[in-house]
Amino acid sequence: MTLASQIATQLLDIKAVYLKPEDPFTWASGIKSPIYTDNRVTLSYPKTRDLIENGFVETIRAHFPEVEVIAGTATAGIPHGAIIADKMTLPFVYIRSKPKDHGAGNQIEGRVLKGQKMVIIEDLISTGGSVLDAAAAASREGADVLGVVAIFTYELPKASQNFKEAGIKLITLSNYTELIAVAKLQGYITNDGLHLLKKFKEDQVNWQQ
């Protein structure tokens, strides 16, 4: 079983992911979605957490061997990033969504050296907007952002476009395609449900029609 498949299995088992193609969720953007993901739940399950953190470390070593600092996005990327940095014996910082409105007004907490090679950790990629904002903030502080590594992606076309335009490499430990395949195999969804989930990936607006 691949890492992507193992993580998809765990996310379903611990109910970090819910699939309801016949009774969709409403995202903050207003989009009706057959999937809801809360990867923060993974922190409460040591087996799942260990699988994810080791997957992060292996992926970073394989794709970004020159990394010098790990950054986590606030708030979901912070615990994962801190554990990864500890496992890799690397410095850790975290990046706020916007600068503090008091004190020194920091957006990045921790010390980033000019030219320091950084990998940013995120838990979930939908369109990628928030983590790309974090990458831009890190670049302004002088970091050399090598890429973003995340637990899971919805594989939305908008995300691919955004990362391409930003010139930032994205790698995820698991993904939507893998998850719905595992969900069907393990009886979480019906054939009709799988069909709807595949349609959502192709067209997030008209998939129910």
Curated annotation (Swiss-Prot):
5-phospho-alpha-D-ribose 1-diphosphate binds at R96, K100, H102, E122, D123, L124, I125, S126, T127, G128, G129, S130. Pathway: Pyrimidine metabolism; UMP biosynthesis via de novo pathway; UMP from orotate: step 1/2. It catalyses: orotidine 5'-phosphate + diphosphate = orotate + 5-phospho-alpha-D-ribose 1-diphosphate. Belongs to the purine/pyrimidine phosphoribosyltransferase family. PyrE subfamily. The keyword Iron does not apply. NCBIfam families: pyrE (TIGR00336). Keywords: Glycosyltransferase, Magnesium, Pyrimidine biosynthesis, Transferase. Orotate binds at S126. It comes from the Bacteria. GO terms for molecular function: magnesium ion binding; orotate phosphoribosyltransferase activity. Homodimer. GO terms for biological process: 'de novo' UMP biosynthetic process; pyrimidine nucleobase biosynthetic process. Its EC number is 2.4.2.10. It holds the Pfam family Pribosyltran. InterPro entries: OPRT, Or_phspho_trans_dom, PRibTrfase_dom, PRTase-like. It is an enzyme of class 2 (transferase). This is Orotate phosphoribosyltransferase. The keyword Ligase does not apply. Catalyzes the transfer of a ribosyl phosphate group from 5-phosphoribose 1-diphosphate to orotate, leading to the formation of orotidine monophosphate (OMP). Its cofactor is Mg(2+). Coiled coil: none annotated. It comes from Streptococcus pyogenes serotype M12 (strain MGAS2096).
